[in-house]
Structures are given as structure tokens and as C-alpha cells.
């Protein structure tokens, strides 16, 4: 069994870790960074760029550069939060045939799990390069407040990337694992405040020593899957755009290129203001009108930034109140507060969290890496490399079915420890009813239509009977990933019908399988593309070196040699205009041969000319005289 890696698939950045001996280790990517931007770009030549390379070209390719796609995963196009996002991103968000939110790139419709899979592939490759072995299994983290369809979509992304997802684990729980595993014995209750790039979670977790086993029990969890650093960036972008409109009368919202530059500048300004009290946003040639080019220059102070985003920070405290209430605790019962997610570096966030919990958050947890480290520890628990650790997570939202009158009847309450199974008996609403529709729901509202619909199925062939007589047992079963199966059984006939909830939307098994095959085909294409680039680089280098040799040779090269070399160069340059790898290799070899004799002749002459010079040098060294020296200290200040 290979190693199980831990991946924090973030909205803004992703991170991969593995248990290396006794210690979990964050793995640096090919660029030498410990985190990778969760950005995927589709270049003009068809190449797929992931991470820093995608981020670097975002300004020149805004409509084909996809960021923060995690906010769309498992969501419907008509969701309010998706509609709000459409006007704020330069790329195109569209409705899929089943109503899901997808993206469109160069006329191609793509599902969010497909885009996330590109990021996961990069993390997989990063781990493989470090370990020197193939990686096929992973633990992937999700926001604790992700619903069933969002979890399922994340699992699909893993499958498309060629990973068997051994477990989906909640981000705050993973951070608690990273923090608590090496802490001294004794019981403690911690609050994990996780404000990342796109999502917010709060989890109250009890860490206890039970018979020598370290037990992490989630008491409650709450959050907002559309609140994060991206929203803070948006506030800055809106402010900069409004200031620019005030001074120039031009609305930058209609210009994707300007929007992308604003996004980069806004994010940079936000980060800078965590350590300084003022910064300047200077974007020359942001746009142009009939009077000529326009420049954006805005001073932004920390207090102005805080006034723009304070509402968002306060919005995060409501779930904290609810989580404490659900755990039946008060802020004073919390022993430690852990901050996770890059946005928690903001001084205002730290101040409000300190004020709310009445204690300073811990500073010894890396907010960018803790989640991936925790995921790798969970991977090691699953593979048996780490023992004496028990993780008890919860389902974040209540689960139930729609009953008469459009009411949601809850079977599993929110914050129930998982895995779990609950059953309840229902009956028919009309006389001689021969079928019932089971409509599974997730949420906290009493009105069924106000909750998230997870799926429907029918139980048919119920024997005719007066209403209320048939006994239909409905069972909800949640696995350790928080993914749900529902079954319904007619007690009289024993007939049973069940489904694994794939959500009323989501990707079908066939679609996922096709995407897996596409990804594998793309991997082969990528390999061929890489080989072609290497061959091209070798050819370019050969042309450059040969031309230099010709110049250096001057008259020493015969007319025949020059002609043969020039012909070989022309033929190789012609081959380079095609994508024919074999042809380029063949013409490179031909040039190597054509220039070989001249290169040898030049080398032999250079060698012959160097020998007398060496003799002279030796003689001059023999004549050297040792001299005394005196240190001069005049310049010493």
C-alpha cells in the first residue's frame, strides 16, 4: 500500500503534506513554494497552466484564467451567491443542462470538479516528485459547512485527478489534528476559527486522552461557504473601481483586463495593510477613452480597509455564537483558539476573535499549512502508520425528508457524530396509495422548499390499504466522509429501494468516468507536449551554438563546410515550424553531424594555441618575489 497524502484543496491556495517518518511534512512544489495558487488557465496553444504560472499570465488572459472555482463546486447556477459572483469574475459562469453552475472556456463547458481536478493533479505530482513513487490515494479536506453535493463533487474531482479519495475530512478538524497531536496529555476544548479564501468555518473540538488514545471529538460546527478572503478582495476592488469612476467617469466593470489588474492590486494592498498602516495602489494605463490613456492612483489606509470589511468580519462571529450554543458552552469554556486560513493574518480579524473569545489566539499554528498537515495525519491513521488517534466528526446540517404539507421531518440532527444511521417509520397520505416518493433534504428550515434538495426516489408496488396503514421505514446512513445513503422499505412486503445521494444535480458516474479518461488522455498529451518542448529547446540551442562556431571560425571554415552547415540550419529551422518531434530530432542530428568536423578542427587549434601560453605562465610564476605587506587603516570609519 502506497502513502496516503493529505491535500488542502483551498479556494485561493492549495497545499499537500505527507507523514515522513514521525512528522508530517508540507511538500514544496516545483517552483519551491509550500502552497500553490488554486488557479487554472487555458493558454492560446492549448496548454493547461496550474498554480503560479497560471497566476502570472492572468492579466493578459483574464477570460480563460479560472480562480476561486471551489465557490461554485456542487452549486446551482441560480443560487444567489453564484449570481453575485458572475459580475465579479472576468471568466464566464454558465448553467449546465442539469442546472449546476459550470464555467465556459474557449467555447468549452467545464464542470467545477474538472477544474479542481487540475489543481489536485498538480498536488499529486508535487507529492510524487518528492516521494519518488506513484501516489494513488489521498485524504482531501473540505469546509466543515459543505453540504452533501459539495462533498460528492470534491470526491469526483479527486477521481478525475486519478486519486482514490480515502476520506473527505473537515478543514477545522484537520487543523485540530495538526495542532493537538503533539500536545501534552490532558483534556482541552479548542475553537478552530477557519477563515480561508472562499469559505468560513468554526468548529468546537474536544481533545481528550481516553485509555492512552488521543480522541478528537467535534462538539459542533457552523459556518458560511460564501465568506472568505475573496470577499475581502471584492470590497477593495469595488472601492478602487468606485474611486476611479468618481475621478474619470469610467466604469471598469465592463473591462475584464482592468478587472483582473484591479484584483491583483487589491489583493496585494490587502496583504500589505496587515503589516503597514498605508499603501498606494498605482495602476498606469488601466484603461483609455477618447481623451487618451487613464491611470489609477489611490491611497488606501488600514483604517479605510477595515471600514470596508468590518461587516464581513462581524458576519463570521454569528456562526461562532451558534457553534458555542450548539455545543452547550460559553466562550470562557474554550481553552485555546486556533486561527486557520490566510485571511486570519488580518489584524482586524485577530482583534475581533480575541474580543469574542476573551483570549488571544495561538500563534504557533501556520494558518496556511495546518489543514494539509492534519489531512496527512488522517491519511497515516487510515493506512495504519499512526495509531492511538480517534477522530469523531459531525454532520454540519440536519438531514430529513419532505412529509405531508411540505414540511421537513428531520431524521438526523445537525452536529450528530458520524458515521451514523437513523430510521423512522412513515405511512401513506391517501387511501390505496401504491407508491411513495422519498425526497431527501438537508438544512435547518421547517419548510421543505427552503432546504437543499439532495435527491428523490420512488418506492412502488405498495399493497392497497387505507391511508396511514402501510408501514414504510426510511433509513438515513451517513459514512465517515459525510456522504449520505437513503433507503425506504415497505415492512409488509419487505420490498426495499435505496440510493446513494448523488444530489439532485452533480455529475453522473458516466460523466465522471469520461472526465477521468479525458484527464488520462490529457496527461499523455501533456507528456508529448513536454517532450516536444525539450526537443525544440535542444534544436534552438544547437542552432545558436553552431552560428557562434561559424562566426568564431571565420576563414578557417571552408566554403563547403559553411554551405553544408547553413543548409542544415535552414532545414532545422523549417522543421521547427512544425510539431513533428521526429523530424526536428532528425534535422538536429543532421546539423550536429554537419558542424561536428568544424567544431573538432576549432577545438584542436584552440588546444594547440593554449600549450605555449601555459609554459609562459609557469615561468612567470617562478620569477615571482614574495613581498611584505602592511595593513592600511586610513579608510576605516
From Swiss-Prot:
Entry-annotated residues carrying Phosphothreonine: 199
Lineage: Bacteria, Pseudomonadati, Pseudomonadota, Gammaproteobacteria, Oceanospirillales
Protein name, as recorded: Chaperone protein DnaK
InterPro entries: ATPase_NBD, Chaperone_DnaK, Heat_shock_70_CS, HSP70_C_sf, HSP70_peptide-bd_sf, Hsp_70_fam
Function text: Acts as a chaperone.
Alphabetical list of Pfam families matching this protein: HSP70
Keywords: ATP-binding, Chaperone, Nucleotide-binding, Phosphoprotein, Stress response
Residues spanning the membrane: none
